[in-house]
UniProtKB/Swiss-Prot annotation:
This is 7-cyano-7-deazaguanine synthase. ATP binds at F8, S9, G10, G11, Q12, D13, S14, T15, T16, C17, L18. The gene is queC. Pfam families: QueC. Its EC number is 6.3.4.20. Catalyzes the ATP-dependent conversion of 7-carboxy-7-deazaguanine (CDG) to 7-cyano-7-deazaguanine (preQ(0)).
Length: 227
């Protein structure tokens, strides 16, 4: 029996990965992390979607320790979300170590479940400047987890080389565009669906959807060439 663990935030990218995984694995398990994030509403969204999509299991893990260590606009309400980069060239929404921790815990969970695949929705094409969304990082994490647990483990990244328009096309391929558009939460300010319309996550999501809807056939062809 094939099993996969999906790092699942309840946002556009992870929900798209989850829906795809349900078509390819016998058992799909979701793992969601509560790190005291600014947009904590995403946790309830993830619970609702996990139930609706009938996952084999859905675990919500308390990792608020990360909030104590990682200072970011996503972990401190007192820091406004900015569209400008910080002096170090990173967005102020970057949470240091977040994906290191998430993939480590997802790998441990997969080990316990007897799953040999972890799926995450990170993307280097539209990666928002986050270093822990790059392909080299994911490969390094996979190697470390395999070495550390002495077990074959693959970290799949279905969106790694897709832009946001192609990610919308992927959702549409699985007849889930409306669900992704209306029922997921990507907004850094915690607003479901179209979101606030002004934070970096909402702007990226909106541009991608507009591009996809403007020329579905061409974007679907691009997606087919990549997948």
């Amino acid at each position: 029996m094939s099993k996969a663990v999906v790092v699942f935030s309840g946002g556009q990218d992870s929900t798209t990965c989850l829906i795809q995984a349900l078509q390819h694995f016998d058992e799909v398990h979701g793992i969601t992390f509560d790190y005291g994030q600014r947009h904590r509403e995403e946790i309830e969204i993830a619970k609702t979607l996990a139930s609706k999509l009938k996952l084999a299991s859905h675990k919500v893990m308390d990792v608020t320790l990360l909030n104590e260590l990682a200072i970011s606009a996503l972990t401190r309400d007192s820091i406004p979300v900015s569209n400008d980069l910080m002096d170090n060239g990173l967005p102020n929404t970057f949470v240091p170590g977040r994906n290191i921790l998430f993939l480590t815990l997802a790998g441990i969970y997969a080990y316990q479940l007897g799953a040999d695949v972890v799926i995450t929705g990170v993307c280097e094409t539209d990666f928002s400047g986050y270093p822990d969304c790059r392909n080299d990082f994911v490969k390094a994490m996979q190697a470390a987890l395999e070495q550390g647990m002495d077990k074959k483990l693959t970290i799949q990244t279905p969106l790694m080389w897709l832009d946001k328009a192609e990610t919308w096309a992927l959702a549409d391929k699985y007849q889930s565009l409306d669900l992704i558009r209306d029922e997921t939460l990507t907004c850094y300010n915690g607003i479901k669906g179209d979101g606030c319309g002004t934070c970096p996550a909402c702007l990226l999501r909106k541009r991608g959807l507009e591009e996809y809807l403007a020329d579905k056939e061409a974007i679907q062809a691009r997606l087919t060439a990549k997948c």
